[in-house]
Regions:
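Terminal non-domain segments
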Residues: 1-50, 167-171
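Low-complexity repeat regions of mature extracellularly deployed or surface/particle-associated proteins
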Residues: 33-171
Length: 171
């Protein structure tokens, strides 16, 4: 995939991410719990009822997680990495970054977004109600199934998108 196509796909993915977060924050109902964890050189875990967040990072890295409405968010960063895990209204998201930037967000019941990268400068994994999405390095690739999902890894050029019925995948 040439650089122009990769950039265009990255910009499109970024636009979709912003739109998804705008819709999710604008249309949500009151949540059972809102939790925020952040870490630089530490490990922070908060559990309240059915909601939980965790952020862990070495001194050169930063991790944040945000949870609303019985979600779970986990972020783990090492080697100068940045990661964010956002679980909203029943979603479960986990991001593990080594030296790059990784964002994982899951919105709605039954949604799961998992990401782990060692070499990517930027990767994103999003999942909507009933969706299952994962991103990793080249050996893992991008996985989209179930409900609405979006995955992209800029280092490998791998990505996928699912509307819950059909799935599109980049090599």
């Amino acid at each position: 995939m040439d650089r122009r196509k990769t950039r265009a796909l990255g910009l499109a993915a970024g636009g979709m991410i912003l739109a998804a977060f705008g819709l999710s924050f604008g249309s949500g109902t009151a949540s059972a719990a809102t939790l925020d964890c952040s870490a630089r050189g530490q490990d922070q875990t908060i559990v309240e009822g059915a909601s939980a967040c965790r952020a862990v990072a070495d001194p050169s890295s930063y991790a944040i997680s945000h949870v609303e409405g019985d979600g779970v968010g986990v972020a783990d960063s090492r080697d100068g990495g940045r990661s964010a895990g956002v679980g909203l209204f029943g979603g479960v998201a986990a991001a593990e970054s080594r030296g790059g930037i990784l964002a994982a967000a899951a919105y709605g019941p039954g949604s799961l977004a998992l990401g782990r990268t060692d070499s990517s400068p930027f990767a994103v994994v999003l999942s909507g109600p009933g969706g299952r999405a994962a991103v990793g390095d080249a050996d893992v690739g991008a996985i989209c199934s179930g409900g609405p999902t979006l995955v992209f890894n800029i280092a490998t050029g791998q990505g996928c998108f699912s509307d819950g019925t059909s799935t599109w995948v980049t090599p």
